[in-house]
């Protein structure tokens, strides 16, 4: 049987908390000084710094780069972490693994198109792989990377990333499907990462592929299902390359013809 409190079943008033028992309070019951909160945030930042530093070592073993490219990537990552606080550029859970999850995953595309100097990255978002590709080609004569992004804040970040890394990138603020035809000059390779299902990506990239571009699309473990779906709309002969950085795959296409 439930016990009833005094005054017609109302529960008694809660006892006052003991001094210092409130969240953020010191032993005298006062709020913890701001300096303590700042020190805690600084400690968290230092911890994340050391995790990212170790992740960088692992990533550069998977995908080695020159010292000049490494320096550019360092500036890019520093900028991304700064902007991440106000603009969601990457999933927060992936921050400790920026180098292996995002940088190395992007760098492996270069080896699949070693002669490509002119790239198009559709739906660049936080710059993967577009900014990474641009960093690797900063000293390549005639190199350029077109980064197409529809969200203004992300496009602003991409422009700043290209500026501080002194990389050969051109940012287009536009809807993906509306802008591909406007890219001037030939494109050797078109890519898109975490943007849309494969059959839609082919639709975005087909105008460039028709002009001779190769397509490289990083995909996850469900690549076979995406290929099956894409084959309903497109005649394609895909090549699959296993990712170095996880269980995913990279779909390579040299041509695509829409089914009647």
Swiss-Prot record:
Q: Does the keyword Membrane apply?
A: no
Q: Which UniProt keywords apply?
A: Cytoplasm, Methyltransferase, rRNA processing, S-adenosyl-L-methionine, Transferase
The biased composition feature labelled Polar residues covers 33-45
Q: What does this protein do?
A: Specifically methylates the N7 position of guanine in position 527 of 16S rRNA.
Q: A GO CC term? A: cytosol
* Single GO MF descriptor: rRNA (guanine-N7-)-methyltransferase activity
Protein name as it appears in the record: Ribosomal RNA small subunit methyltransferase G
Question: What does the sequence similarity comment in the record state about its family?
Answer: Belongs to the methyltransferase superfamily. RNA methyltransferase RsmG family.
EC number of this enzyme: 2.1.1.170
């Amino acid at each position: 049987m439930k016990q009833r409190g005094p005054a017609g079943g109302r529960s008694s008033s809660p006892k006052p908390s003991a001094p210092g028992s409130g969240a953020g309070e010191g032993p005298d019951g006062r709020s913890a000084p701001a300096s303590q909160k700042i020190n805690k945030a600084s400690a968290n930042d230092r911890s994340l710094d050391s995790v990212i530093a170790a992740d960088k070592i692992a990533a550069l073993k998977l995908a080695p780069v020159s010292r000049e490219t490494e320096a550019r990537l360092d500036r890019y990552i520093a900028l991304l972490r700064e902007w991440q606080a106000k603009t969601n550029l990457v999933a927060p859970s992936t921050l400790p693994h920026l180098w292996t999850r995002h940088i190395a995953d992007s760098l492996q595309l270069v080896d699949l198109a070693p002669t490509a100097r002119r790239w198009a990255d559709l739906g660049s978002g936080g710059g993967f792989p577009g900014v990474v590709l641009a960093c690797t080609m900063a000293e390549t004569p005639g190199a350029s990377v077109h980064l197409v992004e529809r969200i203004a804040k992300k496009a602003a970040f991409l422009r700043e990333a290209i500026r501080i890394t002194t990389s050969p990138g051109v940012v287009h603020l536009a809807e993906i499907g509306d802008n591909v035809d406007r890219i001037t000059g030939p494109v050797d390779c078109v890519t898109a990462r975490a943007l849309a299902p494969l059959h839609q990506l082919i639709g975005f990239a087909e105008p460039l592929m028709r002009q001779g571009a190769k397509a490289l699309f990083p995909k996850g473990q469900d690549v076979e299902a995406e290929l099956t779906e894409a084959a309903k709309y497109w005649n394609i002969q895909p090549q699959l390359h296993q990712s170095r950085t996880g269980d995913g795959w990279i779909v390579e296409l040299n041509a695509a013809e829409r089914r009647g």
